[in-house]
Amino acid sequence: MSSESTPDDVQRRIDELVKNNRVVLFMKGTAQFPMCGFSGRAVQVLKACGVEDLKTFNVLEDEAVRQGIKEYANWPTIPQLYIKGEFIGGSDIMMEMYDSGELQQALAG
């Protein structure tokens, strides 16, 4: 039996992470040490919103998830934010939503 994950296994793992955590950010690096500017900006926006229950997933440590997350939401870039199981978007969308107050509303509800 191979230890390789099938694409279906990867999608199930992603689905569990998204559904079992209120706020999930798939990013490059960690909240403490982001490995790209976009991921760093995403973490800062969430901190500015007062998010304390942020679950991050470092896609650089898992190539299968790094590719699989792009298929999961049909979104080509990382970071990707999910709130209450719903795909929100990447760092640009997060910034726009933050500036308009929509992100704070989504996180508060």
Residue ranges and their predicted role:
Residues M1-D15:
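Flexible, polar/low-complexity N-terminal or interdomain linker segments that lie immediately upstream
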Residues D15-D53:
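Local sequence-structure signature of Cys/Sec-based thiol-disulfide redox active-site neighborhoods
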Residues V51-R66:
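Thiol-based oxidoreductase modules, predominantly thioredoxin-like and allied folds used
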Residues E71-T77:
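Thiol/disulfide oxidoreductase modules built on the thioredoxin-like
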Residues I83-G109:
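Non-catalytic, surface beta->alpha helical segment in thiol-disulfide oxidoreductase systems
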